Structures are given as C-alpha cells and as structure tokens.
C-alpha cells in the first residue's frame, strides 16, 4: 500500500477476506478496518478504528494508517483532525514504551498538532534509539523546521542523506525537506 501499488494491496485484501472464515476476532477486525479504508468509507473506518485499537493497541499497521498525517484521520477533512491523531497517539503510548517506530509517529502527531516542545523530545528519543530510521529522520526535519530551527534540520539531513540509499522510500521527500532548509538559509 505504501509503495503505491493499489492493485496489489486490493489483491492482498481480497485474499485475506477469502480466508477469513475461522479467523480470530483480532484478525477479522483488522481485515474489516482495511476493507472500509480501501472502500473509501472514511467515517466508518474511523468508527471501527477506535474499538479495534482499544482491544489491540499494538496493531502497528492499523496505527500507521491512522496516525499518518495523510492517513484515514488526517485525510478525513474533519475539523480538529491533527489533535485527534495526537490524542490517539497519547492514548496508545503506554502500550509501546520506548519503541523507536511508535515514538517517531507520536512525535509527528504532536508536531502536526503544534505541540513542538513535546514533539522535539520524542523525535530526539526516536532518532537516538534508531538513527537509521527514515521516518525518524523525517520527523526530526519537520520538528526542527517548524520550531524555527532550519539550520539544525539542514545539518542533520545533509549528514543523514549521505548514507541513505538514493532509491530509499524517503530519499526524494527528505531531499525536498533539505531543499526547503537550503532555501531558508539563502542557498
């Protein structure tokens, strides 16, 4: 899904639905959520999201689709959507501890909600735990830039991108962020 191969994602969902007899409640709920997302039934997907995460808060695939700023909540058009994502991540945090992946997503949610100081602490924690995490690098660039510290974002991204594969998923996007910082610096 993340790679933009909609047909493959739809085929995987169809295959999952074909073998859904006898699945656990968790698996059925997971498939049901994604069925609603893929069908474009955003409000129904959001309604299914919260009970699913209440029962299975560590379903990281569902969390990632819900927490992404352009995901099911962020792309819903709802008023207050950024705050809803930050609140959801706050509520899930105790289930993830110091997990670098979750912490990077939580930091982005806080940043998008304007909670920049809290976001900075979390993104620094995430990057320290796994300096190779591209989502963490992305979050660090966002938080620094939005906090009025583009020089730190620029220095970080210049160094970080030097070792990241040019065909890596985030390479183009992080290069764009670096370009914004360069423009801000007058370059």
Describe each PLM feature range.
Residues 142-187:
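Long, internal scaffold/assembly segments composed of regular secondary structure
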Residues 21-23, 57-58, 97, 131, ...:
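Short coil turns that delineate tetratricopeptide repeat
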Residues 31-35, 65, 105, 139-142, ...:
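"A position-specific structural signal for the A-helix of alpha-solenoid helical repeats
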Residues 1-43, 70-82, 148-150, 186:
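Inter-helical turn/loop elements of alpha-helical hairpins
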Residues 16, 51-52, 91-92, 125-126, ...:
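Canonical positions in the second alpha-helix
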Residues 36, 70-73, 110, 144, ...:
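Residue at a conserved register position within TPR or TPR-like alpha-solenoid repeats
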